[in-house]
């Protein structure tokens, strides 16, 4: 897999310029931007759209910049962007700020893609090493409200009781590790990897066993992985923990015996968004709706505005630009935690970076890491306005497998009442290409969730209004 962004720097807003003039004889470029949540998908779709002679015979291009949902909407309303993406809803005040002739009736707002918001963290000193931490909504809310400041807080420990962990799902469901006791001295370990993991130039699948609290560690498998299911008969003794690594990326551990987890007293550093962010809006809404006594403010694109109180200024909260910036910050700081769309975490894990996704407790009582499948189930359990396509999540739905912190990203485009140029034709072609071709083909590979058929139908009806 070719990584969509370099990790050294986060996203930066580029200078905003108008659309290149369109002529019948030449391709045109549509200047667009907005949410960073769908950025990895947008990069893939706009690249293939440019070369798709069926959907885009003229070879037109979409120049999309991830600047955050709030800035994206503002630039769209000012007509600096001909197309924008936003993970949060627009406000009438934003239209008023943009001024005439912008009105609520001369643009289209339609759902294009969904995805999971992962709670990403980086923590050394967890025992057993490689354990993927679990968190309830109350624990997540307290951490991001600065009410929990150390990793060995009793609330985090309570979410991670002594228990067996015979199943490990990682990399957006691309890796599945299962363990079953076979006899007093043997166990069966199965590793199921998708072609995506293998095609990522992964050199080695490494499995180690440890007993006596990690005092005795043995490498029991170290070979190039293959796509499909690998079944191994592995040595077993009571208390054995098996760690699974792809090159340098530790996926986690499995065990058939109840194992106590030990956490270090490392201070927690929270990475939040610097920009006005739809990811923040959805994340804060989840906290407010599930834990209103802890996170007692209504949601907002600005983290500091949604924060229940005053954000600490002692360095325990760090602002970062975009989903990329948050993921970069978390992977670079021991004790860090943040929130980002699942693809930004997975691509770093595949590159061997130190970052993990906490398993979040859903309404069915399951602890799950964010995934395309979990997000799809959450969208399916949400309420959708058939006229507008706006999705309202029930964060405590009891659907098995539904990941609770899920968001939808919406496209924004003009009607003929605002813009009568051929820009609209290009934007409409691109939106339909995303819905019909690109998202169904690559969304899950990139870490997103394609919209259900019923929602695509609504989006297509809305897209028909672009330029009309």
List the model feature ranges, each with a label:
Residues 233-240:
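Surface-exposed, short loops/turns at beta-strand junctions within beta-sandwich domains
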Residues 1-11:
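Bacterial Sec-dependent N-terminal signal peptides
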Residues 228-232:
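Short strand-edge motifs at loop-to-beta-strand transitions and within beta-strands
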Residues 4, 19-20, 122:
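Small disulfide-bonded, cysteine-rich extracellular recognition modules and tandem repeats
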Residues 26-186, 190-206, 211, 215-224, ...:
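Flexible loop/hinge segments at secondary-structure junctions
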Residues 17-25:
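C-terminal segment of classical bacterial N-terminal signal peptides
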